[in-house]
Each structure stands twice: as C-alpha cells, then as structure tokens.
Amino acid sequence: MVSFSSLVLALSTVAGVLAAPGSEQYVELAKRQLTSSQTGTNNGYFYSFWTDGGGKVTYNNGNGGQYQVDWTNCGNFVAGKGWNPGSERTVTYSGSWESSGNGYLSVYGWMTNPLVEYYIVESYGSYDPSTGATHLGTVESDGGTYNIYKTTRTNAPSIQGTATFDQYWSVRTSHRVSGTVTTKNHFDAWKKAGLKLGNFDYMIVATEGYQSSGSATLTVS
C-alpha cells in the first residue's frame, strides 16, 4: 500500500534546541525521525516509510537493522527496514510489536512484471488480513503453518503510482514477533498454487497500521 509521493525529512524538532547543551544529540535524533513518506538507506539497510498522513505516526531508524515506529489513531502507514532489491533470502527479525487494532507485522515487498504486492504475515492485530481473500492452500515453514491467499487491488497506490495489481499472502496461524522467515518456501508455494511471480523490487520487515494505535521496535537481519 505504498505510494512515495512526499519525500520530506522531519526536522521541525531541531528548531529551538541548537543553542541548548547537548544540542548535537537533538539534531541527530531529528535527522533519524520521520513523520512523512520517505525511502532511503540507513546503516547498510534499505528503509521505507509511507503514510497517508492520517493521525500521528513517527518512524525512527536505529543502529544496524533496527527501527522503531509509534502510531496513534493513524490512517494507513507501512514502515520498515530490509533490502532493495529483495531476493529469496532467509530473513531474521526480533523485538517487540503491538497494535491495539488493525495492524500487521510481515515480511513485505513488491515485484514488477507483473506488479505484485506481497505479505508474509507473522502477526496481526484485531483484523484478520485474510478476510474476503481467496484461499489457495497452506505452506509449512519455519515451525509454523501459513495459509496462502490472493486478493486484487483496483486503482490503488503502488510503487508504480495508482494501479490495479494482485496481492499474495502467507498468513501464519500462530502469531509471533521474532523468528526466521525462509522466504523461498513461500515463493515456491505461491508458484505451486498458480501465482505468477515477477522481478524483485524492495523487501522489508514491515509494520503496517490502519486506523489503529501501537508501537514496534524491531531488528532485522
């Protein structure tokens, strides 16, 4: 659900602290803190933060593969760290994640030719992301069972602007907020289910929220 329309670094908190003792720390924090959509590289990892501007969402890049995001009564946002391009890699993540309402923790990314948005969902809040989706089977991976689904978005935001595209989902039946995800197992299962894969664009360990509140601190490798 990503449309990178506004690439502005949130530096408003710098004003007023430049003359204060220890102000360099405040400036550095402000450089890391994002409140509007942006992509880039941080400590060797690709990061992506997209928000539709609703509610309050603050994203911070930490050391290495770490990131933190806090949201209150948000509209819709997706944020995280990973790689660009993605690949059939094994992803490890750990930390804390909680959502009071509609939210997902997933290995998330995009493919092109065809344009595909995909989720390997590790945990979610009050809303089951498979609601209304077409069930295509299951895959056993990394000590758990995932249900496979397909949905289609029409005239929706994408990495190529407003477009119509398919979404592929693997949704873990037992929630977790740390572990290893062997993405190749999911890509192979999707192909076996008849889903066409494209060329990798970015891949991140993502926190997504929709009309909810919550917080996450995660480290990706």
Curated annotation (Swiss-Prot):
Similarity comment: Belongs to the glycosyl hydrolase 11 (cellulase G) family.
Pfam entry (one): Glyco_hydro_11
Alphabetical keyword list: Carbohydrate metabolism, Glycosidase, Hydrolase, Polysaccharide degradation, Secreted, Signal, Xylan degradation
EC assignment: 3.2.1.8
Pathway: Glycan degradation; xylan degradation
Signal peptide: 1-19
Catalytic activity: Endohydrolysis of (1->4)-beta-D-xylosidic linkages in xylans
Molecular-function annotations in GO: endo-1,4-beta-xylanase activity
Active site: 117 (nucleophile), 208 (proton donor)
Protein name: Probable endo-1,4-beta-xylanase B
GO cellular component: a single term: extracellular region
Superkingdom as given in the UniProt entry: Eukaryota
Domain GH11 residues, every copy: 33-221
